[in-house]
């Protein structure tokens, strides 16, 4: 009985090896076929696809970005602020400079965004005052 099982397993193994050896080894695998680039004859060369330099320059020069203001001048309250500021003797350039300064000052003093240390470092900050306790620690940008 043992020899019968042994012969059956041996026969199955030999059949499997024969089937594997008869398959065409030289043929490419499916992965290689997927990775190979198809060469199509109807693909245009890169020079035919590219736009002429004059057309490209014409397109790029037509794009003019409007000057970015820190406030919306169409709002009546903003217009009133500008008028009051100019009435005090300042010009609009000075107003824009001051607004940029104070907005930047506010951004830099925001403890949620200000980091004096690498928050992903293995060793935290040394000083107890520099460590920020609370819900905004390390979760500010998510």
Curated annotation (Swiss-Prot):
Pfam families: Augurin. Transmembrane segments: none annotated. One of its GO terms (cellular component) is extracellular space. Residues 1-28 form the signal peptide. It is found in: Secreted; Cytoplasm; Apical cell membrane. The keyword Signal applies. This is Augurin-A.
């Amino acid at each position: 009985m043992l020899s019968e099982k042994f012969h059956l397993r041996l026969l199955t193994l030999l059949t499997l090896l024969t089937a594997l050896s008869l398959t065409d080894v030289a043929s490419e695998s499916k992965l290689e076929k997927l990775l190979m680039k198809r060469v199509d004859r109807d693909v245009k060369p890169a020079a035919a696809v590219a736009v002429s330099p004059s057309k490209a320059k014409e397109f790029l020069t037509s794009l003019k970005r409007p000057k970015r203001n820190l406030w919306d001048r169409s709002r009546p309250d903003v217009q009133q602020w500008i008028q009051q500021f100019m009435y005090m003797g300042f010009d609009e350039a000075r107003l824009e400079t001051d607004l940029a300064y104070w907005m930047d000052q506010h951004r830099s003093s925001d403890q949620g965004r200000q980091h004096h240390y690498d928050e992903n470092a293995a060793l935290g900050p040394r000083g107890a005052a520099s460590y920020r306790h609370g819900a905004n620690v390390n979760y500010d940008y998510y």
